[in-house]
């Protein structure tokens, strides 16, 4: 399996590649302090100092109440940061993405195409690829210093996967009332966030079939869309997840930031989710082995990252 990553369709510096085998994600925050501090500064600028402090405290207590397996790592990352925000940033879930999984035109396995959009400035400039290792083997994690979860990754000889965010559930005419209701629902749950479930999958699942089972059946703290791509031509799917319910679409399939397999009222995420989805669906298996597919509306003002994984 191969992994290609770019931060935009222009000439940019090469993305750093860190070997964290035997070291862990805390070592990345310690070893790449320039990028780590830049991301923390961007978070403070985006959320504001007050929300970073309050959100950090709430996030820390919730992780402790859930007995989250990565809470200790995040606490160590927070100590490295020396400022509030690491707990909040690790639970931030505001990105918009476009992803697809189809048979690779080379005839070898499946191919995952993926962009990540986020209003937080600096994510593209500060992205890294980290080689990590769990019980099931090594994997390449497209990540940022200070982040303990997995959003996009590829495990050679096993599978690749990515997370998209569903719409915010709509309960009322008011955006802020809906935001509050959804946050209250989250704080009452004692399940793992999707980014931590995906990390566990890369750490422990040895096959596409195992990964699909875990992503389909594990209770979640909040809804998520998982795209999973294996090494065989028929190993590909989009898993649309509610907290305790699952809707699977087999490959070829695409996903942006709206429900396709389920009909759940929600508030839109990102720029032109339907347009991004429609373009990705139309591309199918005809995409060249490059980033020419990253064009409007898949490419927009908040696009920070593009990935091709086979």
Residue map of PLM features:
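C-terminus-biased signal that marks the final domain/tail of proteins
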Residues: 1-105, 202-310
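A contiguous strand-loop segment
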Residues: 12, 42-46, 50, 65-193, ...
């Amino acid at each position: 399996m191969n992994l290609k990553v770019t931060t935009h369709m222009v000439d940019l510096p090469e993305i750093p590649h860190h070997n964290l085998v035997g070291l862990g994600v805390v070592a990345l925050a310690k070893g790449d302090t320039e990028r780590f501090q830049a991301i923390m500064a961007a978070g403070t600028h985006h959320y504001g100092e007050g929300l970073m402090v309050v959100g950090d405290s709430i996030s820390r207590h919730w992780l402790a109440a859930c007995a989250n397996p990565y809470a200790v790592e995040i606490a160590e990352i927070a100590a490295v940061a020396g400022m509030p925000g690491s707990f909040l940033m690790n639970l931030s879930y505001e990105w918009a993405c476009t992803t697809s999984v189809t048979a690779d035109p080379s005839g070898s396995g499946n191919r995952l195409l993926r962009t990540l959009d986020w209003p937080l400035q600096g994510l593209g400039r500060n992205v890294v690829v980290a080689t990590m290792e769990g019980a099931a083997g090594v994997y390449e994690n497209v990540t940022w210093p200070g982040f303990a979860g997995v959003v996009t990754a590829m495990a050679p000889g096993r599978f690749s996967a990515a997370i998209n965010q569903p719409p915010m559930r709509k309960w009322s005419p008011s955006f802020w009332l809906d935001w509050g209701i959804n946050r209250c629902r989250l704080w009452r749950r004692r399940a793992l966030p999707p980014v931590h479930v995906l990390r566990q999958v890369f750490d422990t699942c040895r096959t596409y079939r195992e990964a699909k089972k875990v992503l389909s059946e594990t209770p979640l703290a909040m809804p998520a869309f998982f795209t999973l791509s294996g090494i065989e031509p028929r190993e590909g799917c989009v898993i649309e997840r509610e907290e305790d319910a699952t809707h699977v679409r087999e490959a070829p399939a695409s996903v942006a930031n709206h429900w396709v397999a389920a009909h759940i009222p929600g508030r839109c995420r990102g720029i032109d989710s339907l347009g991004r989805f429609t373009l990705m669906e139309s591309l199918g298996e005809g995409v060249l082995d490059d980033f020419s597919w990253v064009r409007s509306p898949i490419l927009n003002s908040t696009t920070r990252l593009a990935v091709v994984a086979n």
